[in-house]
Regions:
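Active-site nucleotide/adenylate-binding loops and adjacent lid/helix of ATP-dependent enzymes
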Residues: 2-205
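C-terminal active-site "lid" helix and adjoining low-complexity regulatory extension at the edge
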Residues: 211-213, 224-275
Length: 275
């Protein structure tokens, strides 16, 4: 992996920002705190050994403005291609224009495939007309991509796992029996975070080498019956830490910035989702 000279970072949570800064200092990596306005970013380029860690919309705005940023990881198509016995449901990746026809008269879960948008969060829709109404209200561009899932999973707990290759490097619970994340949630009697990380490791071990992403954030749920399922896949450089080991998270962030990753894993952000 390349030796980086700077970690360019903007993290909204003061606690997470401090944790990442200390992790970088432990390996002798200087940190450049990015300004609130992307237009003020100057002199930082991936080609010069800069690693990036910031919200997807912020980085999308920088890329649209011509800043050299090269990031890699598992994208929506990788998630949609996982087998049903891993995800627990049927998952389709479709354009906004195609999505209502795919949903038809049946209920489904709909969410944006990449990043977040304040006008369109993951939602349970009753049918195609319900989805059309939500899309009309959100005013998403016609070329936006959605993930459509055939049902909502009833979960007892949820977990976040950062990976590099086939290896989980940091993990944490973020919901356990209805209790939202706090620093003490890791000690909840019903938290199965280590088992969730093992589930992810076994899942990645079963994939062909060419289908293992260089890095990923894999969110996993556990049902009341004790079954694990992959809920979604997020970008390493923009995902929250919860109680994940910041040293492991930093390793994953640097892996996502590695220019030697295969081209198929290069992040191609949707311009409409810029900050």
């Amino acid at each position: 992996m390349r030796q980086f000279r700077t970690l360019a970072m903007r993290v909204r949570s003061p606690e997470a920002s401090a944790a990442m800064t200390h992790a970088a200092r432990r390996i002798g990596l200087p940190v450049a705190q990015l300004p609130g306005d992307p237009a003020e970013v100057t002199g930082l380029r991936s080609a010069d050994g800069v690693a990036w860690r910031a919200a997807g919309g912020y980085l999308t705005t920088l890329i649209a403005g011509g800043v050299d940023i090269r990031l890699h990881g598992a994208g929506p198509s990788w998630f949609a291609g996982l087998p049903r016995d891993v995800t627990g449901r049927d998952i389709r990746l479709v354009s906004v224009g195609e999505a209502p026809d795919l949903v038809g008269p049946c209920p489904a879960v709909a969410k944006l495939a990449d990043e977040k948008h304040p006008a369109f969060s993951a939602a349970w829709v009753r049918n195609a007309d319900d989805l059309r109404n939500r899309l009309r209200t959100a005013r998403l561009p016609a070329d936006s991509t959605l993930i459509i899932m055939d049902h909502w999973l009833d979960l007892a707990s949820e977990y976040r796992i950062f990976t590099i290759g086939r290896e989980p490097v940091a993990w944490s619970p973020y919901v356990v029996e209805g209790e939202e994340w706090s620093p003490s949630l890791r000690h909840h009697r019903a938290s199965w975070h280590d088992e969730a990380a093992t589930f992810v490791a076994l899942m990645l071990a079963d994939l062909p080498a060419e289908d293992v992403p260089p890095t990923a954030v894999i969110d996993v749920g556990r049902t009341d019956a004790g079954d694990f399922a992959v809920l979604e896949v997020n970008n390493v450089w923009s995902s929250g830490l919860y109680s994940c080991d910041p040293d492991g998270v930093l390793r994953a962030v640097l892996a996502a910035n590695d220019p030697d990753c295969a081209p198929r894993w290069r992040w191609q952000p949707a311009p409409a989702l810029g900050a």
